[in-house]
From Swiss-Prot:
It comes from the Archaea. GO terms for cellular component: cytoplasm; prefoldin complex. Molecular chaperone capable of stabilizing a range of proteins. Seems to fulfill an ATP-independent, HSP70-like function in archaeal de novo protein folding. This is Prefoldin subunit alpha. HAMAP family: PfdA. It comes from Pyrobaculum arsenaticum (strain DSM 13514 / JCM 11321 / PZ6).
Amino acid sequence: MSRQDVRQEIQRLIEEYQLVGELLTNLQAQHATVSELLEELTTALDGVRLLKGGAGERLVHIGAGLFVKGVFETKEVLTPLGAGYHAFLDLDNAERVLQERIEEYSRLKTSLEENIGKLAERAEQIRQVLERLGIR
């Protein structure tokens, strides 16, 4: 391998290392977003299950740390269906929709975690090679 070939290979490794780092950053941001959505969906599912539990006084979070106390006798909730559409669904169907979304986002989160792991492993391999070559 000529010096020129070695330089080109080193440059390619450096570029790959930078690209892998950018991809890792993007995947980690997506992972954080999916984790937040899962938390929100789980909270909503808990709320629907509480409503299914029967009448009684409840505290409902209305944002910014504020809660309102009330008695809810509703049998339906306005549920997002996707693509900006909402529908009033009975509590059982709302629970089913939320559970399906939780499963979908859980699979996505697992996939992101696997990809993050693979990219982190590749980044470490490249870093070790560059380190052995005295670069970085």
